[in-house]
């Protein structure tokens, strides 16, 4: 490649921003396409604001630690949880793009006030996944999904959101790490963007990311070993005996999923004997991640059925999650269904 060609390629890459990519994906400039592009831009803005605050967290008062409150999930609320949730609301309240926002941090959806422009979409999100990592400066993330409102929701129950994961229009996450990355899908592949701080723009880094068919990584909180059902314990015993496997678990779903997408393997958050439904929420954690991974050629399951087929019965419903490379997920499923198969594992 000549110097000129390399220069042009670099310029083309720097000009392929998130909003431009969304419009290219939709192959349209109609009102719906413009709205989705604007939605993604607002999500990106929220990500930039959260990334900026995280980068200064150790230097600012009132950023680290707990608020003293407990959220709808029964979890202690971090100060950054509150900030991140408020950022998403502020980014969308005056946008005219959404009619409501539903979050891990709110018992009921936030409805756009009548004195503000109201759109036709719903944003579901986990504003700060893995927030327990903030105080020790490890990776955290934001997870999001976009759905279109169906019906009027006059009773404010958001019952139209209780549909399977195939109804998501878009899904993605923002990873706050050494660089800030935004990974998204509109159902046309999975694409990776990196925030260029000098431009203030998310620039395309990987188009049509493909997860390896199998991988050596298994990501699970083994501290729960004796709380699991026997099939999950048997799977973990199996990988302990096999050469080539490597355990990686950070406590932040976004960070662990990003590793699995890039390197292959499997992430598990199974149910326990006490809580068979597990910990992860379906609508704004598990389903968006499943959508992304399947668009990258991976597989997502509850262990007994495809994750995207699950229909929630309430907004904050939980689900077990097994997600990653197709061969690795199938192996875990085989233990749950009591038909163990031999995996293909890359040596490390």
Swiss-Prot record:
Pathway: Carbohydrate biosynthesis; Calvin cycle. Binds 2 magnesium ions per subunit. Pfam families: FBPase, FBPase_C. One of its GO terms (biological process) is fructose metabolic process. It is an enzyme of class 3 (hydrolase). Mg(2+) 2 binds at residues 126, 129, 285. It is found in: Cytoplasm. Keywords: Calvin cycle, Carbohydrate metabolism, Cytoplasm, Hydrolase, Magnesium, Metal-binding. Substrate binds at residues 129-132, 221, 249, 279. Mg(2+) 1 binds at residues 104, 126, 128. InterPro entries: FBPase_C_dom, FBPase_class-1, FBPase_N, FBPtase, Fructose_bisphosphatase_AS. GO terms for cellular component: cytosol. Its main location: cytoplasm. Its EC number is 3.1.3.11. GO terms for molecular function: fructose 1,6-bisphosphate 1-phosphatase activity; magnesium ion binding. It catalyses: beta-D-fructose 1,6-bisphosphate + H2O = beta-D-fructose 6-phosphate + phosphate. Its cofactor is Mg(2+). Belongs to the FBPase class 1 family. Homotetramer. This is Fructose-1,6-bisphosphatase class 1.
